[in-house]
Structure formats: C-alpha cells, structure tokens
Amino acid sequence: MRYLPLFVYLNNKPVLVVGGGIVAFRKVQILQKTGAIIQIVAKTLCLNLKTTLFKKKIIWIGKVFQISMLDNVFLVIIATDDTDFNDMVFKYAEKRHILVNTVDDPAKCSFIFPAIIDRSPILIGISSGGQAPVLIRMLKEKLESLIPMSIGYVASLAGIWRNKIKQHITDIVYRRFFWEKLFYNGQISLLVEKGNFRKANRVIKDAVLNQLHNRKQGSVSLVGAGPGDKGLLTIRGLQVIQTADIILYDYLVNPDILDLSRKDANKICVGKIAKKHSISQNNLNHFMIQLAQQGNNVVRLKGGDSFIFGRGGEELQAVSKAGIMFQVVPGITSGIGVAAYAGIPLTHREYAHSVVFMTGHKRHQGDYKINWSLLSDNKQTIVIYMGQLNAVNISKNLICHGRHIYTPVAIISRGTYLDQKILIGTLIELEKLIYMVKKPTLLIIGDVVSLHNEISWFGNG
C-alpha cells in the first residue's frame, strides 16, 4: 500500500494554494466544503477565483510566493504550470514537513486527492495512486449510481440517535443487530427520499420502543425485475433487492437477478405463470402480509413491471389495508424491453402514431370485453402479453373488425435472453405460427414489425 487513506479534519486549518488558474479553483472548491482557511498566492486570479474572493471565501495573500508564507500552514496545494517553480515550492514545504500536493505531478506529492463520492457525512475516496485515473473515474461513476443520495441524511439521523440507542440497548451484540435490521429494512431511506424526515425520525423511535417491547416491524417492496436480461434491472431495484430478508418471486424472474440478493435472504417462488399458479392470489396476499407482520423486509419480485399485467395493484391494496409500509420500484415492462431487443420500435412517424398494450389472458371464461374497432387502426401498434393463449381469437377479431390480413406480426419467445426466438409473419398466419414457439410469448402486431429485418441487433432474428 503506497498511500495510506486518511480523512483529514481541515475546519479552520490554514491551507495554502499556490496558483490562480482554473485548476487551482477546482481544488479550492473541494477545500471550501471542509471549512478550511484558504490562502491564495498567485500573480493573477481567474474569474471564478475572483468571484470566490469577492464572496470572502478565500484570502489572496500575495502575488509573489515567499518562504514565510509556509509558516503555520497545515498543507499546501501547488497548481501552476511552471515545473521549476513547483519543484522549488515542493522542496521548501517538504523540509518543513508540510503535506504537499502538486497537481498532476505524483512525484511531487506527499498526499494525493482521491476521487470523492460525497454523501456527507458518508464519504468514499477511491484512488489508484495515479496509475489508472480513467479506471478510477469509471469506478466512481459506478458507485455514484449505486449509492442513494438519501444515505447521507440516514447516517446523520443515525448519529443523532446513536447515544440514546446506546443507553436503551446496552448489549453491544443486540445493538449491532438493531442497527443492521434498521438499515437493511430500507424504511428510513424510503421516507427520506420522499422528503418525509419527521416520519423517518419516528420510525427510529418506534424501532427502539419495539426493540424494548420485543415487537417487530416489517415492510413490502414491490419490485419490477424487467423482461429477463439482468442488465435491465434498475439501479433502484438492485438496491431494494439487496435489503430483502425474504424475496417472493415469480417463475419468470431471471435466476441471475436472484443471485444479486443477500446470501442470507430467503427466496421463495410463488408461481405466477398464466394458468399455472403455485399459490392463489388471495393466499399469496395473506402470506406476504404475514411475513411483513413478523418484522421481515419482504420484496415481491415480478417480471417486467408490477403495474402492467402483474397484479401489483391488487397486492398493494391488500398490503395497504393491513397497514403495512410499502414502496414500488418500477421495472422495464416486457412490451417495451422485448420489443427493443427484437429491433422493433413500437412507434414510428411512418408506421405507427400510437401503441396499445393488452393481455391475451382472460380472467374468466367467455369473450373479451375489448373494443375491437378501436384496435382496427392500421397506424396503431398492438402489444399482447401472454399472447399465445388466445392468439387465434385475437387474430380473427382484428381481421373481422378491419385490420388488414397482411399486417406484420412478430411472435417473440424468451425475449432479451441470449436464446430469444423471433418469428415474423402476418396476421392471417398467426394461427399456425403461434404454436411454433414456446410459452411465454409476446405478440407485436403492426407495420412497425417490418422494421425488424432492418434494425435487428440482438439474439436470433
């Protein structure tokens, strides 16, 4: 380890910045957040530094560097393009055992600035010691996207309660379990993201009381897993999955997504394939509520988006009625994700001015209560979930109500997976084509399907 990572307290500490250009200004911006007393020595100041000086955020102590300027300085930042001058200042500072950073010159640095992820009071610094700055930038971008902005306020809230909880929960092991449960639960982060700070504070207070009285709190998170490819899971979805105590998932959820959960999370398959349910909807609702009431952070993980033909609304009605805290994390619905992976734009100025999503699954026996005339517009794209179930009936009704028999049709199975299969035909051919692919399938009907051959980019076209 060439560099020791440290977090330095600079509040009211004198820091000398040598240089007055834009590079110096960038370092000043970082230093301002620490409360340091920032002194500048430079012949001239760039416009940004002049503005900062006008606001009295920095002190311009001189135009020419003097050795005496190093007196009582905590650290020095050198930001000029004069190599010889930089070397001189560095040597003077080194002799006085003052920490020095010379911008973009690691050989003249006794400390370096890491890439900083600021979720104050939580701070993360990343560095390669100057070996791979582009790689560090990529890592920073990755972490920035994964760490919620709310985590800083959550940490501050925990700091406010830390001593009180220490007084109430004296056993160090139980206290650690308390904090782990509180943070894994995700309720506080959810409330903070909504701006409900008072309720977030109340959750901690209630958690302390519940701990003292041996009561538990739980929650339900409805998460859309996307159409298949685990890369289409949202960042928010990943964050919530990783807080789950129990995951209730459908058959269609990619196992690779389940592998992203905590190792100690209990994963339970609850079915949900058309005409093949391992558990009834009412029993599932009751089971989910029961788990949450036992104090578990329950994630209900569904393929696609939970609110589009996913019965998510029905499940949350039951959860809400039971008085359990819940949240919803949208997912990329199959109609959009699968179409994109098939190279089929659902709208196009030349071919389609609107798109309709419908399901091929009927809740009860009998005919659809569908306005077929509305779907007969040849400038409209129709996307049918679980389309294999009633494809013949759908085809006949569309043709009967004026849809052209040669309207292009796409039948897609295992969409967004590497082994996805796409069959292209026409509306009149749908009856025979539908049995050539495995369930579940997505049907796309409309002239936009003709673009598949031109812009197909993924899988088996």
UniProtKB/Swiss-Prot annotation:
Its EC number is 2.1.1.107, 1.3.1.76, 4.99.1.4. The modification Phosphoserine is found at S128. Keywords: Cobalamin biosynthesis, Lyase, Methyltransferase, Multifunctional enzyme, NAD, Oxidoreductase, Phosphoprotein, Porphyrin biosynthesis, S-adenosyl-L-methionine, Transferase. PROSITE patterns: SUMT_1, SUMT_2. The active site is at D250, K272. The keyword DNA-binding does not apply. Pfam families: CysG_dimeriser, NAD_binding_7, TP_methylase. S-adenosyl-L-methionine binds at P227, G303, G304, D305, I308, M386, G415. Residues 218-461 are annotated as: Uroporphyrinogen-III C-methyltransferase. It catalyses: uroporphyrinogen III + 2 S-adenosyl-L-methionine = precorrin-2 + 2 S-adenosyl-L-homocysteine + H(+); precorrin-2 + NAD(+) = sirohydrochlorin + NADH + 2 H(+); siroheme + 2 H(+) = sirohydrochlorin + Fe(2+). NAD(+) binds at I22, V23, K43, T44. One of its GO terms (biological process) is siroheme biosynthetic process. GO terms for molecular function: NAD binding; precorrin-2 dehydrogenase activity; sirohydrochlorin ferrochelatase activity; uroporphyrin-III C-methyltransferase activity. Pathway: Cofactor biosynthesis; adenosylcobalamin biosynthesis; precorrin-2 from uroporphyrinogen III: step 1/1; Cofactor biosynthesis; adenosylcobalamin biosynthesis; sirohydrochlorin from precorrin-2: step 1/1; Porphyrin-containing compound metabolism; siroheme biosynthesis; precorrin-2 from uroporphyrinogen III: step 1/1; Porphyrin-containing compound metabolism; siroheme biosynthesis; siroheme from sirohydrochlorin: step 1/1. Residues 1-204 are annotated as: Precorrin-2 dehydrogenase /sirohydrochlorin ferrochelatase. In the N-terminal section; belongs to the precorrin-2 dehydrogenase / sirohydrochlorin ferrochelatase family. Then it catalyzes the NAD-dependent ring dehydrogenation of precorrin-2 to yield sirohydrochlorin. Finally, it catalyzes the ferrochelation of sirohydrochlorin to yield siroheme. This is Siroheme synthase. The lineage of its organism: Bacteria, Pseudomonadati, Pseudomonadota, Gammaproteobacteria, Enterobacterales.
